[in-house]
From Swiss-Prot:
Pfam families associated with the record: PGI
Top-rank lineage group of the source organism: Eukaryota
Main function: Promotes the synthesis of starch in leaves.
Name of the protein in question: Glucose-6-phosphate isomerase 1, chloroplastic
Length: 613
């Protein structure tokens, strides 16, 4: 795999009470805590659920009263906690989060431990103990950090090969074999999860209005969605570069998307291999397939980079570079932010400030949601990107000591000012179960392109007013918020905010003592899905045997379940039958799917070969 050596081939604990009668425990003792003196014993152990309940009662009983209202005091707090990264032009405002100085002091030991853990992670320690892996996405934007010279060389050579390949595609040096345009005009990216969300966010944020190649995504196993993307390409399928992204090559959704696209190529009389690119781990199923079939190029994925942090690897960089986005600037922005977030001073570390505010606002147990509101159309997908980064990293059943903690932080959002006409009504006046994060972009348009709709007011001024007005209206009703401000949306600033949140997630995971870098729940879902498909094959076998009888023997759900030796799966069997019936793959002899008790089904035809398989 030439490209893997750098060449592309052209063949929890709880928040302390505001009255300080309740003190947070260290991370190793989160399953109990002590009450102040009452008529009952002082050291009363509670279950985690009880602890969560008490923490919410103590922390938020007078939350509105505790938030500063005096303008002078608020301005002083704003200045005291205002953070600026001058080189990146990034500001962080946490003045509308009501943490206390005592809380910051109590969190200091945890953060110092988190900073040390992050330092060890960057040096190559096993930061993902459940899978025995290093975690190296920070090395991707500063290869000098890589713990081995071979990794440093691999990172640098891969970046060079991505840029060279992209230049050759854009310039037309590498051409599709059958395109009348004589060059590639479209990208079809096939991947799911981090292999899709990262490239989608970057494309939406940074692609020029008229990119050298336009990009489309197949990010699901929905047949109608796949058909739509292929149909939209139309005759341009002949000039489409298909980028297939899968670490193993065995991810069902990505494999299905690939097979569907290959079918479309065959039906159009096109040679898929001459237009296919694989981004995968060396010697994976996908890598071997691409090598044997002679795909256009192959680029590496690494076992030390997870999907949700892969945006600075070939996963995110290749699609971006093909759209004419300056990926080296994106890496520079990320590297600058990485440097800013290595300081061990909480007050001077923007990622630590975010993690601290998340902990305060959600009691360290995810008791409140994080609503992400980017006031810029091009950043619309940032909330979806953060949804995976935060929730897949922090949503864990067990901590690093094996205790059941059910940690997490729910993330959702929309763009401003669309949110003004959607759910801000509930955020301000409804249930108080969230804190907000505003993403502000100062520059509205490129220099020289702005104009006034009315004297002294531009279109962008209205957007600015909506953001600031919403922030003020929420705070006036006791709703806490964080504001992240960048000068403009550029590859550098996008790289910076990605790196900011990656580091914040890692630090937060450390202070609540969980592994941010594995996803056992996702794997459990994949296993359960595989079991459903295995059951479906048994159902089809039973139905085929009954259909091949003379006369045909329609079966009830109970009979199917019995012959599958799975009476406990009768509900799932019904769902399988209903789905297959809707797609004309089983026929109903009696009843209908709306009446499960009476239904009898059989197949449309007997497959004799399957009887003897």
């Amino acid at each position: 795999m030439a490209s893997l050596s750098g060449l592309y081939s052209s063949s929890p604990s709880l928040k302390p009470a505001k009255n300080h009668s309740f003190k947070a425990l260290p991370a190793q003792s989160r399953d109990s805590f002590s009450f102040p003196h009452t008529s009952k014993p002082t050291n009363l152990p509670l279950t985690l659920s009880s602890a969560r309940s008490v923490a919410r009662d103590i922390s938020h009983a007078d939350s509105k009263k505790e938030l500063l209202k005096d303008p002078d005091a608020l301005w002083k707090r704003y200045l005291d906690w205002f953070y600026q990264q001058k080189e990146l032009g990034l500001y962080l405002d946490i003045s509308r989060v009501g943490f206390t100085d005592e809380f910051v002091a109590e969190m200091e030991p945890r953060f110092q431990a988190a900073f040390k853990a992050m330092e060890d992670l960057e040096k190559g320690s096993i930061a993902n103990p459940d899978e025995g892996r290093m975690v190296g996405h920070y090395w991707l934007r500063n290869s000098k950090l890589a713990p081995k010279p071979t990794l440093k060389t691999l990172i640098e050579n891969t970046l060079d090969s991505i840029c060279a390949f992209s230049d050759d595609i854009i310039s037309g040096k590498i051409k599709p074999p059958s395109s009348p345009e004589g060059r590639f005009t479209q990208i079809l990216s096939v991947g799911i999860g981090g292999s899709a969300l990262g490239p989608q966010f970057v494309a939406e944020a940074l692609a020029p209005d008229n990119p050298p190649l336009k990009i489309r995504f197949i990010d699901n196993t929905d047949p109608a969605g796949i058909d739509h993307q292929i149909a939209q390409l139309g005759p341009e399928l002949a000039s489409t570069l298909v980028v297939v992204i899968s670490k193993s090559g065995g991810t069902p959704e990505t494999r299905n998307g690939l097979l569907e696209v290959q079918k479309a190529f065959r039906e159009a009389g096109l040679n898929f291999a001459k237009q296919g690119v694989a981004i995968t781990q060396e010697n994976s199923l996908l890598d071997n397939t691409a090598r044997i079939e002679g795909w256009l190029a192959r680029f590496p994925m690494y076992d030390w980079v997870g999907g949700r942090t892969s945006i600075m690897s070939a996963v995110g960089l290749l699609p971006a570079a093909l759209q004419g986005i300056n990926v080296r600037e994106m890496l520079t922005g990320a590297a600058l932010m990485d440097e800013a977030t290595r300081t061990t001073s909480i007050k001077n570390n923007p990622a630590a400030l975010l993690a601290m505010c998340w902990y305060w606002a959600s009691n360290g147990v995810g008791s409140k949601d994080m609503v992400v509101l980017p006031y810029k159309d091009s950043l619309l997908l940032f909330s979806r990107y953060l949804q995976q980064l935060v929730m897949e990293s922090l949503g864990k059943e067990f901590d690093l000591d094996g205790n059941t903690v059910n940690q997490g932080l729910t993330v959702y959002g929309n763009k401003g000012s669309t949110d003004q006409h959607a759910y801000i009504q509930q955020l301000r006046d409804g249930v108080h179960n969230f804190f907000a994060t505003f993403i502000e972009v100062l520059r509205d348009r490129p220099p020289g392109h702005d104009w006034e709709l009315e004297p002294g007011v531009t279109c962008g001024d209205y957007l600015f007013g909506m953001l600031q007005g919403t922030r003020s209206a929420l705070y006036a009703n006791g709703r806490e918020s964080i504001s992240v401000t960048i000068q403009e949306v550029t590859p550098t600033s996008v790289g910076a905010i990605i790196a900011l949140y990656e580091r914040a997630v890692g630090l937060y995971a450390s202070i609540v003592n969980i592994n941010a870098y594995h996803q056992p729940g996702v794997e459990a879902g994949k296993k359960a899905a595989a079991e459903v498909l295995a059951l479906q094959k048994r159902v089809l076998s039973v139905l085929n045997e009954a259909t091949c009888k003379d006369p045909v023997e329609p079966l009830t759900l109970e009979e199917i379940a019995d012959r599958c030796h799975a009476p406990e799966e009768i509900e799932m069997i019904y769902k399988i039958i209903a789905h297959m019936s809707a797609n004309d793959r089983v026929l109903i002899a009696e009843g209908n799917c709306g009446s499960p008790r009476s239904i009898k089904v059989y197949l449309g035809e007997c497959n004799v070969d399957d009887l003897y398989a």
